Amino acid sequence: MCVRVPATSANLGPGFDCLGVALDLANEFEFCEADRFRCVVHSTVSPEDARQVATDERNLAWRAFTHLFEHLGKTPPTVALTVMMHVPLGRGLGSSATAIVGGIAAANRWLGSPLSTPEWLLLASRLEGHPDNVVPAALGGCQLSILGETLLTCALDWHPQIALVLAVPDFALATSKARAALPKTVPHTDAVFNAVHLALLVRALATGDARWLAEALQDRLHQPYRTGLIPGWQDVRAAALEAGAWGVVISGAGPSVLALTHLDCAEAVRQAMASTWPNACLYCPGLDPNGCRVEVEAG
């Protein structure tokens, strides 16, 4: 059984912990029945990334796999797990969500799909702690989600002329460190600011309206507290805006940076960001419309 789960970029500015988009870059998790647990990790990103992933029973995909079995009161099988990593670790691209979704989706299919997609997605979101990466990783596209006693998800329209430019720097930022930078409370005016801008962003993404997007991508809940953790943020943001980007946001907890621009400007924005961050990898990723895919080998 092989599970392919896309990378994600969460928040998109004002959508803190509730908004995310699936990208056309994915990790793959292969589960095969075996006589003893084994885990092998390969990375096309870097050998260092592969070394950072646990290959014992602490492996996150394996823990997610067994979590669903235990949730249903079942004994998990012994498997050989192979992980093929294409999503870099610690860059704000939802690598942990790929493991959680991959493990839970595989376990559900292994058992004959006893849980509906909303049911196992709730389990995955609770395991992750927030749904902004997990939901688009599972469902694809751009997703708005709310996690409470239940999980509510809403697929958002994405105008075809909106392009993404992603800058992935050559340094990592631990999500725990990025979370620790956030205050426990924020001014009421900042909360109102984000509520208004998130509402506008939903319409702006659907219409592709340039003025709306330029306004809507602003944030006061998390980015002002995290930009100091990303060396070069101000310069790469300024370069992207100068080249025609509507807005520039931190991808997830960072340190990757995501620019939104018109399709016709994407290459100019990519080159401008690359000239400012010469050691970063620059992409113009498309959206993954499908999300998690499970393939079961016949026989």
Swiss-Prot record:
Pfam families for this protein: GHMP_kinases_C, GHMP_kinases_N
Residues at which ATP binds: 88-98
One annotated GO molecular function: ATP binding
Keywords: Amino-acid biosynthesis, ATP-binding, Cytoplasm, Kinase, Nucleotide-binding, Threonine biosynthesis, Transferase
InterPro entries: GHMP_kinase_C_dom, GHMP_kinase_C_sf, GHMP_kinase_N_dom, GHMP_knse_ATP-bd_CS, Homoserine_kinase, Ribosomal_Su5_D2-typ_SF, Ribsml_uS5_D2-typ_fold_subgr
EC numbers: 2.7.1.39
Record localization: Cytoplasm
Catalysed transformations (reactions): L-homoserine + ATP = O-phospho-L-homoserine + ADP + H(+)
A Gene Ontology biological process term: threonine biosynthetic process
Family: Belongs to the GHMP kinase family. Homoserine kinase subfamily.
Record's function text: Catalyzes the ATP-dependent phosphorylation of L-homoserine to L-homoserine phosphate.
UniProt-recorded name of the protein: Homoserine kinase
Source organism: Gloeobacter violaceus (strain ATCC 29082 / PCC 7421)
Highest classification ranks of the organism: Bacteria, Bacillati, Cyanobacteriota, Cyanophyceae, Gloeobacterales
